[in-house]
Amino acid sequence: MSKIVKVIGREIIDSRGNPTVEAEVHLEGGFVGLAAAPSGASTGSREALELRDGDKSRFLGKGVLKAVAAVNGPIAQAVIGKDAKDQANIDKIMIDLDGTENKSQFGANAILAVSLAAAKAAAASKGMPLYEHIAELNGTPGKFSMPLPMMNIINGGEHADNNVDIQEFMIQPVGAKTLKEAVRIGSEVFHHLAKVLKAKGLNTAVGDEGGYAPNLGSNAEALAVIAEAVKAAGYELGKDVTLAMDCAASEFYKDGKYVLAGEGNKAFTSEEFTHFLEDLTKQYPIVSIEDGLDESDWAGFKYQTEVLGDKIQLVGDDLFVTNTKILKEGIEKGVANSILIKFNQIGSLTETLAAIKMAKDAGYTAVISHRSGETEDATIADLAVGTAAGQIKTGSMSRSDRVAKYNQLIRIEEALGDRAPFNGLKEVKGQ
């Protein structure tokens, strides 16, 4: 009943209006899985390759017809007749057939779309929700938890057209008892933030991930306006709501210095920028910082981990790119204490699960994440619950491409009830 009989690839549009790959996997019992690959803006240099056509006459060169052709051609031929329930085998077949280190032959966007569609079809054939199937693939059947959301309510850096250097300023509704309550708190703070910004004469247009993207006097001012919004919403900062940041520091690392253009081109060494961040953590209840230095600055990251690693969660995104080889090196060297998990950085479900397992086995936390270019596909919600990862980063409280994930989490929590606890701040490293 779970043998693959047909695979279809197509070019669809993501939340930024760019093409991406969608795949359908059909099984002999009539079961179908449908999945789409997301796409990043601030990408790590060691990510698996997202294959684009480069034909400037279509979609400004961003078409994905080559990747779609790979799905409809060699990938389909290789996986038809195989058992979709054997995820590791499906993924291995595609990776081996691609034959490159970074999936550049077919594109990680092609391989991932088929990988996720196969998992969805297999779950349907087993008559179970995707999160339950993922828990079985993960070797943790029946073990679930609802993730603490990191909600990106002020966007800067590569995600917005403003003067804020740090890419994401996030809230975590740690005072919530359930995921559904966390979403409500996030929504209320989000709306109060709009009022705070408007009162200051600031822009309330939103960035790629649904957060506001105002021009501010400094990066610290983003934290100040969020603190004001939390209070206005009737919550206590540090008790009901904590803060998190994604610096995406690789984006402002120039000639060995960290240059904050939005603050008059202030330049910092690795140590100085670490202490700049440390000062912010003393002023505000920041419990998690992602990519606080450049992805290649391992000596700096080691220092940052020594200074901040026992106090807060230090998440490697561009640093680790969901890659077990790089994560292993980070664990051995004592660099960071958490990994951001993005399917499309590595390009298959099997490799994603391996990265989560490696992190957890080493005492690192794993934060499941969207990309800035998303679709209505909400698979990361099921991934977060099915691996009991504990944390999720899927944008703000606007744009359907973000909200789709929160809504799926609400549905899953309703279905699982007490079987999926919401552990809040306990999930965050160092808290």
From Swiss-Prot:
SMART domains referenced in this protein's UniProt entry, alphabetically: Enolase_C, Enolase_N
Main location, first listed in the record: cytoplasm
Binding site for Mg(2+): D246, E290, D317
One GO CC annotation: extracellular region
PROSITE patterns according to UniProt: ENOLASE
Record pathway: Carbohydrate degradation; glycolysis; pyruvate from D-glyceraldehyde 3-phosphate: step 4/5
Pfam families per the UniProt record, alphabetical: Enolase_C (PF00113), Enolase_N (PF03952)
Subcellular location(s) per record: Cytoplasm; Secreted; Cell surface
Coiled coil: none
Entry note: cofactor: Binds a second Mg(2+) ion via substrate during catalysis.
Top class in the EC scheme: lyase
Entry's EC annotation: 4.2.1.11
Record-listed (2R)-2-phosphoglycerate binding positions: Q167, K342, R371, S372, K393
Protein origin, superkingdom: Bacteria
Cofactor(s) recorded in Swiss-Prot or TrEMBL: Mg(2+)
Keywords: Cytoplasm, Glycolysis, Lyase, Magnesium, Metal-binding, Secreted
GO annotation terms (biological process): glycolytic process
Molecular-function annotations in GO: magnesium ion binding; phosphopyruvate hydratase activity
Subunit structure: Component of the RNA degradosome, a multiprotein complex involved in RNA processing and mRNA degradation.
Family under the similarity heading: Belongs to the enolase family.
Function: Catalyzes the reversible conversion of 2-phosphoglycerate (2-PG) into phosphoenolpyruvate (PEP). It is essential for the degradation of carbohydrates via glycolysis.
Name of the featured protein: Enolase
Species the sequence originates in: Yersinia pseudotuberculosis serotype I (strain IP32953)
Gene coding for it: eno
